[in-house]
């Protein structure tokens, strides 16, 4: 249809030769020209597509600009979110390690504490089971166990202190667990937001990959931005080409109007056909000239005179262009359809970027809220647990030492009682040996005494009458007699200083002990004993003690 420009541009010239009769017969009739004018007028409805193309380009350009901004913001947020998420999970891991380490250490300490307490309780139970032999206690006293000589208030106070430490540690552990559970809930919420983000990104990627113009975006979590400028450029080219096509349709319409007006009887018909044309939208802009002004100018312009040859050439061009006008209209329609499809892809990518940005903002808001309000509390709770555990761990360690000391002390008490029984048996044996020595000595002394008495009596009978009584006054005296004296032993050297501040024994106690530091026995054979009392223990009791001592020695070696 470009040939219409050259034909319609000739405003007049020298008249050509008269047309032949054949040419006059082949010239189209007015009805034919009017039908071409009506068709040309109808083709001008494509101006709506041109206006729409202009809107599409404007919308696509705005969408591209918005997409660039949103994509940049999303990329910036994603980089920040990745760093924050790594930091957040590092904090959660460290807090969990504090909890697990504290729980493990606490469990180990409790195990040691239970073992130490079990040993102490076994020792106390042995004290309860060990009955003091009646020979060590006053006559008539109710049987007593070794446990009766133990003051358990220290054990109870130690248990109470340990229980307080355990309760405080358990409380701190429970608070840390509660804090960690809340932390996990926060992470779960963030995971849900991240899941929504991934779902949106996956959906956007699938939509982007389904577009022929953005096939490279199928493996990306964000729609491809590289395809959008080319789309916009393609839209601009389509719009410009549509404007050019519309201009050709306008020129064809102008040519039809001019041809009808120059045809006899066509002026009124042209006015009737074009009288109702109103172009209410200004289509001027980057994509073409002001079409409204051009149409109105052509409709109202005065007719220029044409020669017959010019008229014939104009009609020839008109008929030729009329065959192409429908193709031009179809091309405009096809181009606007392709532009609509491209715009749909551009808007879909923009909407996908918006969705991803909104999902990213949602995750960022979760992280920001967590970091600014609750995360410091979770970290502080871990520090509080560490502080409490260190304090109570030291106290429990001291309690373990105290339990071990008490257990050792009570074990020593049991061992000392066994040693006391052995000591009593030893003293009893020594006493028996002393008594034997005394009996043997008494027997020999009695023999010597009798021999001496008999010898003196024989001497007196034989020589006494011849000796004056004053020659040796002792000559008639009986031999001396030997009496043994038992002396109550004093305190053992080491026990003297320990008992220095003890109260003095009462008179009854002194009488029970023998009446004083010394005790004279009337005779060796006197059975009345007023010195130290050594209990007489059953042989099987002593043997049991020996067996326990041997077992204890084996267990320690």
UniProtKB/Swiss-Prot annotation:
Cellular location of this protein? Answer: Cytoplasm; Preautophagosomal structure membrane
Task: Give the range the annotation lists for the signal sequence.
Answer: none
Q: Which residues form a coiled coil?
A: 334-355, 428-458
Which InterPro entries does the annotation name? Answer: Atg17 (IPR007240), ATG17-like_dom (IPR045326)
Q: Which portions of the chain have biased composition (kind: Low complexity)?
A: 205-227
Give the UniProt entry's GO cellular component terms: Atg1/ULK1 kinase complex; phagophore assembly site membrane
Presence of keyword Coiled coil: yes
Membrane topology listed for this record: Peripheral membrane protein
GO MF annotations, alphabetized: molecular adaptor activity; protein kinase activator activity
| Keywords attached to this entry | Autophagy, Coiled coil, Cytoplasm, Membrane
Keyword Coiled coil listed: yes
BP GO terms, sorted:
autophagosome assembly; autophagy of mitochondrion; piecemeal microautophagy of the nucleus
Q: Name the source's superkingdom.
A: Eukaryota
Pfam families to which the protein is assigned, alphabetical: ATG17_like (PF04108)
User: Where are the stretches annotated Disordered?
Assistant: 1-25, 204-227, 495-532
Family, according to the entry, reads as follows: Belongs to the ATG17 family.
Reported function:
Autophagy-specific protein that functions in response to autophagy-inducing signals as a scaffold to recruit other ATG proteins to organize pre-autophagosomal structure (PAS) formation. Modulates the timing and magnitude of the autophagy response, such as the size of the sequestering vesicles. Plays particularly a role in pexophagy and nucleophagy.
Which protein are we looking at? Autophagy-related protein 17
């Amino acid at each position: 249809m470009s040939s219409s420009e050259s034909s319609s541009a000739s405003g007049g010239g020298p008249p050509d030769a008269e047309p032949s009769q054949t040419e006059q017969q082949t010239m189209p009739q007015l009805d034919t020209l009017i039908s071409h004018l009506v068709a040309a007028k109808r083709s001008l409805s494509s101006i709506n597509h041109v206006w729409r193309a202009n809107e599409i380009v404007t919308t696509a350009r705005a969408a591209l600009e918005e997409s660039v901004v949103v994509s940049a913001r999303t990329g910036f947020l994603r980089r920040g979110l990745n760093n924050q998420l790594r930091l957040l999970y590092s904090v959660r891991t460290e807090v969990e390690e504090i909890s697990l380490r504290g729980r493990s250490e606490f469990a180990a300490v409790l195990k040691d504490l239970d073992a130490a307490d079990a040993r102490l309780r076994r020792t106390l139970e042995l004290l309860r089971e060990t009955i003091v032999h009646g020979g060590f206690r006053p006559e008539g006293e109710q049987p007593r166990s070794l446990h009766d000589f133990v003051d358990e208030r220290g054990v109870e106070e130690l248990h109470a202190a340990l229980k307080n430490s355990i309760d405080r540690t358990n409380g701190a552990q429970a608070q840390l667990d509660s804090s960690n559970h809340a932390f996990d809930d926060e992470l779960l919420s963030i995971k849900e937001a991240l899941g929504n983000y991934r779902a949106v990104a996956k959906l956007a990627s699938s939509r982007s990959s389904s577009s022929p113009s953005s096939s490279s975006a199928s493996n990306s979590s964000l729609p491809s931005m590289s395809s959008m400028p080319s789309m916009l450029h393609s839209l601009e080219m389509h719009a410009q080409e549509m404007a050019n096509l519309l201009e050709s349709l306008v020129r064809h319409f102008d040519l039809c109007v001019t041809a009808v007006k120059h045809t006899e009887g066509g002026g009124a018909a042209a006015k009737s056909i074009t009288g109702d044309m109103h172009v209410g939208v200004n289509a001027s802009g980057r994509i073409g000239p002001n079409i409204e002004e051009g149409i109105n100018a052509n409709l109202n312009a005065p007719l220029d005179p044409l020669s017959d040859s010019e008229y014939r050439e104009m009609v020839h061009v008109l008929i030729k262009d009329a065959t192409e006008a429908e193709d031009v209209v179809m091309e405009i329609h096809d181009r606007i359809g392709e532009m609509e499809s491209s715009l749909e892809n551009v808007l879909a990518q923009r909407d996908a970027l918006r969705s991803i940005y909104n999902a990213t903002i949602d995750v960022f808001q979760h992280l920001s809220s967590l970091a600014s309000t609750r995360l410091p509390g979770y970290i502080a709770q871990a520090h509080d647990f560490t502080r409490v555990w260190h304090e109570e761990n030291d106290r429990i360690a001291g309690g373990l030492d105290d339990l071990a000391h008490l257990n050792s002390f009570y074990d020593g008490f049991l061992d000392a009682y066994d040693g006391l029984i052995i000591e009593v048996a030893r003293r009893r044996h020594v006493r028996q040996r002393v008594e034997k020595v005394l009996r043997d000595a008494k027997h020999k002394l009695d023999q010597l005494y009798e021999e001496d008495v008999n010898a003196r009596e024989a001497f007196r009978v034989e020589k006494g009458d011849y000796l004056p009584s004053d020659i040796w006054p002792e000559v008639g005296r009986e031999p001396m007699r030997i009496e043994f004296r038992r002396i109550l032993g004093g305190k053992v050297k080491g026990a003297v200083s320990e008992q220095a501040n003890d109260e003095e024994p009462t008179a009854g106690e002194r009488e029970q002990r023998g009446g004083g530091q010394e005790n004279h026995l009337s005779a060796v054979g006197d059975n009345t004993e007023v010195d130290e009392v050594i209990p007489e223990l059953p042989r099987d009791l002593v043997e049991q003690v020996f067996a326990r001592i041997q077992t204890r020695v084996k267990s320690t070696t």
